[in-house]
């Protein structure tokens, strides 16, 4: 890099992800603290919040930092329906800023761009003016811009209720961090697959819907008033389905009132996602 760029200290980054994150948290990995090396931390796997390595690190003022956040996660996360939302995305980055002041880089992962316009737009706005960004203000402005001053507040309320409809399969363990654990659409699909397979190839109930050593499901039955993980999945998703169905019904009522162009965007970015999650969770 020095030869190609001609710079004595070309800017580089190292992505601290997966096992590297575990090694950092355990104190086994020590990247050099250089003003030309961005320490690019990553949200935790399967559920997207700052991992222990970031929460335990306090960077020198001269150490540049970055962050990798999964809006979509093609394993157990959001895939066809936005699950994380602007508030959670913002809180992840605010916790990065608590670690050190020199934030240089932010990466959001989203393969299906069409399904995540709200959260991706929120991220773009946040990075444009990180200091002044606020998710509530962004949501109000986003909805007013796309759906007009008359209907914008109604759509904003629907977005809030949609994101809060997700089943939270265990209680948050980071103080002041709501919606830390979510049962995303792919978790619903994986759980249905595992339960159907178990009817053909029975396995002990204690092994069903486990974490597989990587936090695959992260179900705590008692947090949902259940005795087993299977019962928790049934109860949690039934309740989530009712919440999503209520949001979908309100979307059905509002959609015909919107202008044609606004209606198409509304239907694809919110109404259909609420209906999908209602049907999948039922």
Regions found by a protein language model. Give the residues of each.
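Substrate-binding groove of N-acetylhexosamine-processing glycoside hydrolases
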Residues: 1-282
